[in-house]
């Protein structure tokens, strides 16, 4: 029997944000609400902060609540107030500042994703700050974004009164602030956001929602050898891995990622990590305990470099464009000519590679793109190898000294046999070399002459000197 696994997420509310009266906003109670003649049950379900809506349907939905016919009542009405194309005149009546900032947030514009995809696929370097999922063209990179990637931005319209944690995309304000669609009551608009609202978008790409809850995507062939019953509703096979200690303790996503992160209050960030305001030190006093793990030689390490238990990694991706096929265009909201076929393989969910970020600190990196691409505009297929920084959200006890100081994977060289002798690093890769001279799971080679690509200036793999320092460090 095949069990479909929607989520392995415990929805625990640690923080319930109180609803506050919005300064300068006054809701007028309007008598004679004819909406309830057909929708009497929808007066129930409101939380206190939105209880005015029980007799003021048109405040959010529009329409005419004095009309007596269905046609007249529904004229100019919207069934989903809170979609970003109507949020200014619905949610914006009370939350104008939030609607404005959300519309400029990365969850709507995807600035960093658009910029990196264009750079890698088309080789173009445009104005990162102006990149936007709502203004895509039709070149290879933008076509890929239209057909495969832009389904997760908040501007996507919601068109069904139901929740699907795995497949849900978009919906503007509703994407986060509605947790249930009861049949006999009005959905409760709430600042209590469940992890299920994050899962639909954040279980792909970096797979943060999966990792946090202790699930990891695997190859179907691998699943056949393990527990094939573990499968998401969209068909992806997963395995159980150690969950993040914060998840195990009952912390939800919004316990750390609050409005300042999610609704662009932090500013006009281009990349996701620049929009995140929360830090480990907000809760954990960073003390330099008297032991080897915290001595000065580790001062450049980010907390997650040692405390991440594993990192989701994928080393085999193939993308092929078929101009004769048809596929849903998430910008046009219709099926259009051209289809991208995507194949993924070679998953690994183990400790990952270390690299240097733009602040000269050492953090974890994972394959952002190790793939081949085919498009009729190109004479030959393209091969792309790019590693990106990642916060895996698999926090736990610190990894062992050996897992860094005696590991070729940690150095970014990929799996294989490594040793330091005769003042030289000797490495024999476990996997065959690809066309660019590196094995599939490597980011760079020992002298840094191959690979090494990262999304942003200043990000890089460890250099030879840093590798030697890691390998020659005495172990306890």
Where are these regions (language model features)?
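Positively charged n-region of N-terminal signal peptides that target proteins for export
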Residues: 1-5
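Bacterial N-terminal signal peptides
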Residues: 6-16
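C-type cytochrome heme-c attachment and multiheme electron-transfer modules
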Residues: 14, 19-44, 53-174, 192-476
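Thiamine diphosphate
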Residues: 175, 184-185
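A generic local secondary-structure boundary/capping motif
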Residues: 187-190
């Amino acid at each position: 029997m095949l069990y479909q696994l929607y989520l392995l997420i415990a929805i625990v509310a640690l923080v319930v944000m109180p609803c506050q009266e919005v300064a300068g906003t006054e809701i007028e109670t309007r008598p004679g609400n004819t909406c309830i003649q057909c929708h009497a049950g929808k007066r129930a379900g409101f939380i206190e902060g939105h209880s005015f809506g029980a007799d003021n349907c048109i405040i959010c939905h529009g329409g005419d609540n004095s009309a007596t016919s269905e046609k007249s009542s529904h004229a100019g009405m919207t069934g989903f107030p809170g979609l970003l194309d109507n949020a200014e005149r619905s949610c914006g009546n009370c939350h104008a500042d939030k609607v404005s900032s959300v519309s400029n947030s990365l969850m709507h514009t995807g600035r960093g994703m658009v910029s990196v995809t264009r750079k890698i696929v088309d080789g173009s370097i445009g104005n990162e700050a102006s990149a936007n999922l709502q203004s895509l063209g039709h070149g290879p990179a933008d076509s890929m974004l239209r057909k495969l990637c832009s389904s997760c931005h908040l501007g996507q319209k919601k068109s069904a009164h139901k929740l699907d944690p795995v497949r849900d995309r978009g919906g503007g304000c509703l994407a986060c602030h509605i947790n249930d669609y009861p049949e006999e009551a009005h959905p409760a608009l709430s600042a209590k956001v469940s992890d299920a609202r994050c899962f639909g978008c954040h279980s792909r790409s970096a797979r943060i929602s999966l990792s946090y809850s202790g699930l990891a995507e695997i190859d179907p062939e691998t699943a056949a050898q393990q527990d094939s019953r573990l499968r998401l509703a969209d068909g992806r096979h997963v395995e159980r891995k150690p969950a993040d200690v914060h998840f195990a303790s009952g912390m939800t996503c919004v316990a750390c990622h609050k409005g300042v992160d999610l609704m662009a209050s932090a500013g006009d960030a281009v990349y996701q990590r620049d929009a995140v305001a929360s830090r480990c030190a907000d809760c954990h006093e960073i003390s330099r305990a008297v032991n080897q793990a915290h001595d000065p030689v580790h001062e450049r390490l980010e907390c997650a470099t040692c405390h991440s238990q594993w990192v989701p990694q994928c080393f085999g991706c193939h993308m092929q464009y078929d101009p004769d096929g048809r596929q849903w265009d998430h910008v046009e909201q219709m099926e259009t000519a051209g289809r991208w076929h995507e194949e993924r393989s070679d998953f690994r969910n183990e400790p990952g590679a270390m690299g240097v970020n733009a602040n000269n600190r050492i953090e974890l990196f994972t394959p952002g793109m190790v793939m081949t691409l085919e498009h009729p505009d190109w004479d030959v297929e393209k091969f792309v190898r790019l590693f990106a920084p990642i916060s895996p959200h698999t926090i736990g006890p610190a990894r062992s000294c050996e897992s860094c100081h005696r590991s070729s994977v940690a150095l970014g060289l990929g799996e294989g046999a490594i040793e330091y002798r005769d003042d030289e690093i000797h490495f024999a890769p476990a996997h065959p070399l690809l066309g660019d001279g590196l094995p599939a799971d490597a980011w760079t080679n020992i002298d840094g002459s191959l690979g090494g690509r990262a999304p942003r200036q200043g990000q890089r793999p460890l250099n030879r000197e840093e590798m030697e320092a890691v390998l020659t460090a005495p172990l306890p």
